[in-house]
Amino acid sequence: MSVTADLTGAQAKAATLIEALPWLARFAGSCVVVKYGGNAMADPELRREFAADMVFLRYAGLKPVVVHGGGPQISVMLDRLGIDSEFRGGLRVTTPEVMDVVRMVLLGQVGRELVGLINAHGPFAMGLSGEDGGLFTAVRRQAYVDGQPVDIGQVGDVESADISAVTHLLEAGRIPVLSTVAPDADGVPHNLNADTAAAALAIALRARKLVVLTDVPGLYANWPDRSSLVSEVTADELAKLLPSLESGMVPKMEACLRAVRGGVPAAHVVDGRVAHSVLLEIFTSEGFGTMVTPG
């Protein structure tokens, strides 16, 4: 390779860094909550790249907090153990036996692996769950099938949050990695929806952004029409769109809506199948995915 080619490549890298400068200045010291899931969690290379992105945010002066689910991994483990599992109203029926597996997979497998990948770059990540330090108190969630209530067991929503454990970690320069298991008022553990938990945490932390990783490029106003991708939408506009959305996008967009209506300045849905999608959203002028604003 010629010296000229080397210089051109170096200049291109420098231009990319300079493009990020205003965003580095804008978000320095800000908390960003990232909901980690989908293919970004399933693909080994994307897992490593996501971990590196979180470390980059930390070195860039931001305060990332990761909230993860683990539905596919839970299903694999249940099958391996020969435990029957079913879904009602789009939610996994969580018996006490299933709850034991949920806790084992989220805390002992998914969370631990992500902590390890982040800490390959330095001693930054600390794993915790909604059970630690009274972080979350859950309330049992009601599901409906054909308009009728059904019992789905130990599945919960966030009733309240005590963020002191997370803020202490952030003040110490750590990257909290949160597994979505939390007790109710009676101490019974519940499996929380990770999108809902991420939104609740973003509100409680007064985060600058909520970023939700998905397996699609963003919100489509008229799925599967690929030309209907929405780059920006207000809370009121999103509320009108929700009833018509594809079922898999509803909890993610509801989380974004809840976050911005709860005081988070912006929430984003980005394609986790694209390497470094979180960085593309935060540090480029074009942004990435769909942004939800208060309006």
From Swiss-Prot:
<dbReference type="InterPro" id="IPR041727">
    <property type="entry name" value="NAGK-C"/>
</dbReference>
<feature type="binding site">
    <location>
        <position position="92"/>
    </location>
    <ligand>
        <name>substrate</name>
    </ligand>
</feature>
<feature type="site" description="Transition state stabilizer">
    <location>
        <position position="252"/>
    </location>
</feature>
<dbReference type="GO" id="GO:0005524">
    <property type="term" value="F:ATP binding"/>
</dbReference>
<comment type="function">
    <text>Catalyzes the ATP-dependent phosphorylation of N-acetyl-L-glutamate.</text>
</comment>
<dbReference type="InterPro" id="IPR004662">
    <property type="entry name" value="AcgluKinase_fam"/>
</dbReference>
<dbReference type="Pfam" id="PF00696">
    <property type="entry name" value="AA_kinase"/>
</dbReference>
<comment type="similarity">
    <text>Belongs to the acetylglutamate kinase family. ArgB subfamily.</text>
</comment>
<comment type="pathway">
    <text>Amino-acid biosynthesis; L-arginine biosynthesis; N(2)-acetyl-L-ornithine from L-glutamate: step 2/4.</text>
</comment>
<dbReference type="GO" id="GO:0006526">
    <property type="term" value="P:L-arginine biosynthetic process"/>
</dbReference>
<dbReference type="GO" id="GO:0042450">
    <property type="term" value="P:arginine biosynthetic process via ornithine"/>
</dbReference>
<keyword id="KW-0418">Kinase</keyword>
<feature type="binding site">
    <location>
        <position position="191"/>
    </location>
    <ligand>
        <name>substrate</name>
    </ligand>
</feature>
<dbReference type="InterPro" id="IPR037528">
    <property type="entry name" value="ArgB"/>
</dbReference>
<dbReference type="InterPro" id="IPR001057">
    <property type="entry name" value="Glu/AcGlu_kinase"/>
</dbReference>
<dbReference type="InterPro" id="IPR001048">
    <property type="entry name" value="Asp/Glu/Uridylate_kinase"/>
</dbReference>
<protein>
    <recommendedName>
        <fullName>Acetylglutamate kinase</fullName>
        <ecNumber>2.7.2.8</ecNumber>
    </recommendedName>
</protein>
<keyword id="KW-0963">Cytoplasm</keyword>
<keyword id="KW-0808">Transferase</keyword>
<dbReference type="InterPro" id="IPR036393">
    <property type="entry name" value="AceGlu_kinase-like_sf"/>
</dbReference>
<dbReference type="GO" id="GO:0003991">
    <property type="term" value="F:acetylglutamate kinase activity"/>
</dbReference>
<dbReference type="GO" id="GO:0005737">
    <property type="term" value="C:cytoplasm"/>
</dbReference>
<feature type="binding site">
    <location>
        <begin position="70"/>
        <end position="71"/>
    </location>
    <ligand>
        <name>substrate</name>
    </ligand>
</feature>
<keyword id="KW-0547">Nucleotide-binding</keyword>
<keyword id="KW-0055">Arginine biosynthesis</keyword>
<keyword id="KW-0067">ATP-binding</keyword>
<feature type="site" description="Transition state stabilizer">
    <location>
        <position position="35"/>
    </location>
</feature>
<keyword id="KW-0028">Amino-acid biosynthesis</keyword>
